[in-house]
Amino acid sequence: MKIKNSLKALKARHRDCQLVRRKGRVYIINKTAPRFKARQG
C-alpha cells in the first residue's frame, strides 16, 4: 500500500479505483487490481 499526501493522481491510475473514507482516513481501494491500494497521510 502506498502512503501519499494527495490521492488525486492515484485515483486516475486504474479505472476501478474507488475513493473511500474509513475511520477519518482516506483510502483508494481497487478490487480487481489490489496493487493500486493507497492511503492518505
Curated annotation (Swiss-Prot):
It comes from the Bacteria. The keyword Amino-acid biosynthesis does not apply. One of its GO terms (cellular component) is ribonucleoprotein complex. Pfam families: Ribosomal_L36. GO terms for molecular function: structural constituent of ribosome. One of its GO terms (biological process) is translation. SUPFAM superfamilies: Ribosomal protein L36 (SSF57840). Keywords: Ribonucleoprotein, Ribosomal protein. HAMAP family: Ribosomal_bL36. Belongs to the bacterial ribosomal protein bL36 family. This is Large ribosomal subunit protein bL36.
